[in-house]
């Protein structure tokens, strides 16, 4: 497939051909989208889902909450659409609001009708959704990659367009290199971006195996970095490191619950020794009471 140049598609959105001005233009995107175009109440049945929607996680629970909000407060931010030559309107931004409005039983929804061609719609949809705070890291990474490929942009140019640092853009784009199983853990928020960045040091089955351990044992980012480092230096000892980190996490949790210092040590015969340290005598009675309860 031939890559599209930056050209008219992005200019239609940013109203400029100068990359030096794109950051300022995108920073005021919300205002410009409100000011430009035609506001109208459209029949909900005349709207069609956009083909550039980066969001995958349209969970029933989230839609139900949004539908309840729309029932009580209405739609505050208009849905951005464009007219289709075949009739009806295509959603550029606001598909969740549209689906929730249908669920809430609305017949019409407020819309901002934009006059944009295909490439302009691609840029507008991707950038509007990338700038949303509730996209998960994997959705944002995939949307950034599509924006980059669609307009043949460098990491720096993508950063200028969306108003983020080049380092942030590069780190997000690297998430697309993760194994599919690890991506799913990130999409379902079983892993955070910090975990994923550490896991990028591993490959293939090893990456998946360690990611599953991290998610199951709810390791911190720091613990994940330690585990990955050990895997790279001595793969045969990775299991022991994982168990040590799990014991460390358990010790910390017990210390918080008992309000006392708790240490857990594995003995050579496979057993474990738990030590509870108290700095004041009267805390012993409190500890006994907690253990009895």
UniProtKB/Swiss-Prot annotation:
Pfam families tied to this protein: HTH_ParB, ParB_dimer, ParBc
Signal peptide feature range: none
Alphabetized CDD domains for the sequence: SPO0J_N
Protein origin, superkingdom: Bacteria
InterPro entries xref list: Chromosome_partition/occlusion, HTH_ParB/Spo0J, ParB/RepB/Spo0J, ParB/Sulfiredoxin_dom, ParB/Sulfiredoxin_sf, ParB_dimer_C
Keyword DNA-binding: yes
GO terms under cellular component: chromosome
Keyword Ribonucleoprotein: no
Keywords: Chromosome partition, DNA-binding
Example GO BP: chromosome segregation
Coiled coil: none
UniProt xrefs under PANTHER family: CHROMOSOME-PARTITIONING PROTEIN PARB-RELATED
Family, similarity comment: Belongs to the ParB family.
Known role: Involved in chromosome partition. Localize to both poles of the predivisional cell following completion of DNA replication. Binds to the DNA origin of replication.
Protein name: Probable chromosome-partitioning protein ParB
Species assigned in the record: Vibrio cholerae serotype O1 (strain ATCC 39315 / El Tor Inaba N16961)
């Amino acid at each position: 497939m031939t890559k599209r140049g930056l050209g008219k598609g992005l200019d239609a959105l940013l109203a400029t051909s100068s990359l030096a001005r794109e950051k300022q233009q995108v920073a005021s995107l919300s205002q410009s989208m409100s000011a430009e175009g035609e506001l109208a109440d459209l029949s909900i049945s005349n709207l069609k889902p956009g083909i550039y929607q980066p969001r995958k996680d349209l969970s029933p629970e989230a839609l139900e909450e949004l539908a309840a909000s729309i029932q009580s407060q209405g739609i505050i931010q208009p849905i951005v659409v464009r007219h289709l030559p075949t009739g009806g309107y295509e959603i550029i931004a606001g598909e969740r609001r549209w689906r929730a409005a249908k669920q809430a039983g609305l017949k019409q929804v407020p819309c901002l009708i934009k006059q944009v061609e295909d490439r302009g719609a691609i840029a507008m949809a991707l950038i509007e959704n990338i700038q949303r705070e509730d996209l998960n890291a994997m959705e944002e990474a995939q949307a950034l990659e599509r924006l980059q490929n669609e307009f043949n942009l460098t990491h720096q140019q993508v950063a200028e367009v969306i108003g983020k640092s080049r380092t942030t853009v590069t780190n997000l784009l690297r998430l697309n290199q993760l194994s599919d199983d690890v991506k799913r853990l990130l999409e379902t928020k079983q892993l955070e971006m910090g975990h994923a960045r550490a896991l990028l040091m591993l490959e293939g089955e090893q990456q998946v195996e360690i990611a599953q351990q991290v998610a199951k044992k709810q390791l911190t980012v720091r613990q994940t970095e330690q585990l990955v480092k050990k895997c790279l230096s001595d793969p045969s000892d990775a299991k022991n490191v994982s168990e040590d980190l799990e014991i460390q996490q358990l010790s910390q949790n017990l210390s918080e619950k008992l309000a006392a210092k708790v240490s857990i040590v594995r003995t050579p015969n496979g057993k474990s020794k738990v030590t509870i340290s108290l700095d004041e005598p009267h805390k012993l009675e409190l500890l006994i009471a907690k253990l009895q309860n």
